[in-house]
Amino acid sequence: MRVIGTVGMPGSGKSEAATVAANAGIPVLVMGDVIRQECRDRGLDPAQHHGRIAQALRDEHGPGAIAHQSLPIIEDHLTDATTVLVDGIRSDVEVTTFRDAFGDDFTLVHVSAPRELRKARIEDRDRPGDTDGEPLDAREDRERGFGMDDAIDLADVRIENTDSLDAFHDAVRDLLAADTPHTEVPDNHD
């Protein structure tokens, strides 16, 4: 059993890593989907209210709320798969929740890219909620407020996403194929 979590600032490549995992047949839990579902359950448009509901869940149920809501979904995936990728961890409390649940079978991967590159990617990807709502500065501040920097500091592995998309995909595939969950993956740039 392996549970691989990704952490990184917006536009760093977490979703792209999740796509690589999904293409390899690995189940992916997108933590943002938990929030989007909560928005819909509350009769709200996820594109407009994602950030507010993410904060509300944490205010209502504690800083590990989204991770706790994710655990049964991950455990369900693990009944049929040996590896699950959790996309979009936002805080050290969430890291602790997953480490408590999965022990040494949990690996946290920091997907990293410089801010200007991330900003350009966000502007280019045309994802709902990226450019028509919250500015990047506000989004980064909100995520840092959740404990993103502390979560990043807890990462077991770092993948630098500054080279080509193919190079990044190769680095993610290397991580997914590693014999041990904490195998270091070299940065994918020269």
From Swiss-Prot:
Organism annotation: Halobacterium salinarum (strain ATCC 700922 / JCM 11081 / NRC-1)
Top-level taxonomic group: Archaea
PANTHER family xref list: DEPHOSPHO-COA KINASE (PTHR41930:SF1), UPF0200 PROTEIN MJ1399 (PTHR41930)
This protein's UniProt keywords: ATP-binding, Nucleotide-binding
This protein's name: UPF0200 protein VNG_2452C
Entry keyword Glycoprotein: no
SUPFAM superfamilies associated with the record: P-loop containing nucleoside triphosphate hydrolases
Family per record: Belongs to the UPF0200 family.
Signal sequence residues: none
Single Gene Ontology MF annotation: ATP binding
Binding site for ATP: G8, M9, P10, G11, S12, G13, K14, S15
Nucleotide-binding recorded as keyword: yes
Family annotation (Pfam families): AAA_17
Region feature Disordered, mapped onto this chain: 120-144
